[in-house]
């Protein structure tokens, strides 16, 4: 509903389409700030903690391949800044105009198989990163809504998230808490 209400005005103001990816990227950036143990890479026997939160966004190319341009310092961008950055990188990727700095330095990756109407999948970690978030297709589903007056059934937009992570660094508790942070942020996001 939020996207439908705001997409035309957003396009007029920012010159880019309003998608869910900037909101998801914002949630991931906040989760990485809250759980810096996930914003690391593995170098041999060493774990390298990253100072910057640089989120890679998998972009499908016309030839069927994928490339992962990087939104540098994603935690310093607001929703508008994220939308413009993601749109710009995706266009550059599809026009084969990415520069080396556009694909370098990622500390975490998001892949959106929902673009292809897949509900969920198992993303492969973009090494040397230690985790990747997979985003599924958003569809309407019946859901139980808990209220003080009792439970009721309503139609809600649902999206599956999947997190793959390197168990040498991220255990189940950390991975579960990280994913819960993202899901909770998205479920309670006000726009």
Regions found by a protein language model. Name each.
Residues 1-191:
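C-terminal catalytic/motor cores of large multi-domain enzyme assemblies
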